[in-house]
C-alpha cells in the first residue's frame, strides 16, 4: 500500500487530525515558509503525536549544526532536505534516514538522482525561487518506468482529486501532500480524510 505523508503541521488541531487519520508520516517545516514552525513548538506537538506516526523534519539549506541539533532535540525519524544540499552536506547525517528532494521540470532533472546516496528521493515541482509547498504539479509521465534502487516519494500539487491518477502513473512508495489538504492556509480534516482514503483505497 502506498504510504502517506502530511506535511506542514503547525497546530494542535493538526496533530489531533493526524492521530485520528493515522498517515504514515507527518512533516514539520523548519525552513522559512508560511508553514515554518519553531523547534519548541514542534517539540510540544510531537509529544502529542501517536507514536506509530513517523516524524519528518523538512530543511532547506540549513546550516549542518542547526539541522543536527533540531533532529536530535526532536528525535526525528526522517530528515528531508528540500534545498540545494550536496552529497557532502548529506554525509553529515549518516545516523539518520535521509530523503532528498529533487525538483522536476522535465526528464533531464532525473539525472540529479545520480549525485546522491540517500534513503529516498522526493520528486517535487520545480518552481522558481520556491522550495515546495506550492500546490503545483509536474508532468508525472516523466517518472513512468523510471527505476531507482531506493523508494520514490511523489510530491507537488497532489490533492484528493488527482492523487489516484498520480499513483497509477508513478507507482511511488509514498505520496506527500501539504497545500492539497488545506483550506485558507490551514489543514482541513475533511480534505485530509478524503486524501488518505483515496490513497488507501487503491488496490
Curated annotation (Swiss-Prot):
Its EC number is 5.3.1.24. GO terms for molecular function: phosphoribosylanthranilate isomerase activity. The keyword Isomerase applies. It comes from the Bacteria. It catalyses: N-(5-phospho-beta-D-ribosyl)anthranilate = 1-(2-carboxyphenylamino)-1-deoxy-D-ribulose 5-phosphate. Keywords: Amino-acid biosynthesis, Aromatic amino acid biosynthesis, Isomerase, Tryptophan biosynthesis. Belongs to the TrpF family. PANTHER family: N-(5'-PHOSPHORIBOSYL)ANTHRANILATE ISOMERASE. This is N-(5'-phosphoribosyl)anthranilate isomerase. The gene is trpF.
Amino acid at each position: 500500500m502506498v504510504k502517506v505523508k502530511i506535511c506542514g503541521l503547525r497546530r494542535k488541531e493538526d496533530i489531533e487530525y493526524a492521530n485520528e487519520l493515522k498517515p504514515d508520516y507527518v512533516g514539520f517545516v523548519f525552513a522559512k515558509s508560511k508553514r515554518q514552525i519553531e523547534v519548541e513548538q514542534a517539540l510540544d506537538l510531537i509529544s502529542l503525536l501517536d507514536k506509530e506516526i513517523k516524524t519528518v523534519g523538512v530543511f532547506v539549506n540549513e546550516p549542518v549544526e542547526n539541522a543536527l541539533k533540531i533532529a536530535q532535540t526532536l528525535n526525528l525519524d526522517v530528515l528531508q532536505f528540500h534545498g540545494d544540499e550536496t552529497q557532502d552536506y548529506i554525509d553529515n547525517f549518516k545516523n539518520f534516514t535521509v530523503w532528498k528532494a529533487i525538483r522536476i521540470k522535465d526528464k533531464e532533472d532525473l539525472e540529479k538522482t545520480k549525485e546522491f546516496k540517500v534513503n529516498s528521493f522526493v520528486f517535487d515541482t520545480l518552481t522558481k525561487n520556491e522550495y515546495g509547498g506550492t500546490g503545483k504539479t509536474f508532468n508525472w509521465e516523466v517518472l513512468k518506468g523510471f527505476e531507482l534502487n531506493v523508494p520514490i516519494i511523489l510530491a507537488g500539487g497532489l490533492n484528493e482529486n488527482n492523487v489516484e491518477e498520480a499513483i497509477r502513473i508513478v507507482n511511488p512508495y509514498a505520496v506527500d501532500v501539504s497545500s492539497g489538504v488545506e483550506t485558507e492556509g490551514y489543514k482541513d480534516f475533511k480534505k485530509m480524510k478524503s486524501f488518505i482514503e483515496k490513497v488507501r483505497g487503491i488496490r
